[in-house]
Amino acid sequence: MLHKHASGTTRACACSAAMINPGINRFCDVAVVGGGPAGLAAAVYLSRFLRSVLLFDAGDGRAELIPKTHNCPGFPDGVSGKDLLARLRAQAMAYGTEIVAAGVKSLTARPGAFVLATTTGHVHASRVVLATGVVDRAPAMHGLRKAIAAGIVRLCPVCDAYEVQGQRIAVVGPERSALKEALYLRHYSRDICIICNYPEDVSGSTRAKAGAAGIAVRDFVDDLVPRNSGLDLVMADGSTERIDVLYAAMGCDVRSELAMEVGAHCDEDGYILIGPHAQTSIEGVYAVGDVAKALNQIAVGFGQAALASTHIHNAMLAERAGSRCEKEPEAHHQSPNPRPGG
């Protein structure tokens, strides 16, 4: 079964008129790359620390696709991804963050600063926060984005399995990840199946484990057709089976290219490895949100943003204090009025 990126083609950022282009050779304290929840949260913190912040938003983040999330703290009635992002943008800009509707093409470490080559110019930053996220893989099907918006196709059972309790659920993906996700969803519904194109796509071992958990395996699924309510599995013989929800357990592509450019350590899947303050293996470069090796959740991204921003601010305070201390002995040594008898 072919797949494509859930985000579709890259879109221009639907940004406020308050957003500006950075111009050529701008300097800022911190450059944040990525305008999703984690990047925007970092910008809020850093701006409130009185740091100059440029945030680059290419406008193709996965949060835009969220129809409504009910597990984001503080929103008892749920919140759509677009609404959450709009609130975060307004909050960041209210404290002075400059949001740039542009992507970052490259990141280079230079003495005393990092240089970001953007689609509108070059920016020099003392610190960099990477919040570049991931791109979900999803099944190739007509009307995918509408199906995601309608909640018929879902990408995150941790986020929204609560909302599909007792429904007819199908899972598509490589057999190991599909089985893992199906077993997770089995806690919420008894009607779970794994779908595939051909019988050889799912091994006997996986079938046995699925069967033991009461999970069916549907072979010869040729097409997926969204309906007003649910989705039809179209079999090779032309027959159909209606389900309520399809979960795509197809993995994602991690946007860690900028981190790799400066030599930051990543795992085998491309996720950026971070320390307790969201710092990467490169001093001055931090990673927050889904691009970092952790649970891909908005709340986790918020926490990482707070940790990274506070660490950046404290490190810059220490640098400033250190430079003052280094200058003081030199000034004393050059004093034109030495003490008598000295």
Give the residues covered by each predicted segment.
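FAD-binding core/adjacent interface of flavoenzyme oxidoreductases
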Residues: 2-5, 9-31, 99-167, 245, ...
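Short, well-ordered coil/turn residues at beta-beta hairpins
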Residues: 34, 131-133, 138, 172, ...
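Glycine/Thr-rich phosphate-binding loops of Rossmann-like dinucleotide-binding domains
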Residues: 138-139, 179-180, 256-257, 295
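FAD-site-proximal beta/loop scaffold in flavoenzymes
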Residues: 146-163, 250-300, 307, 314
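Beta1-alpha1 glycine-rich phosphate/pyrophosphate-binding loop at the start
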Residues: 20-21, 28-83, 173-200
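A Rossmann-like FAD-binding core segment of flavoenzymes
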Residues: 11-14, 92-111, 116-118, 123-125, ...
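A conserved FAD-binding loop/helix module that cradles the flavin
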Residues: 43, 179-181, 288-333
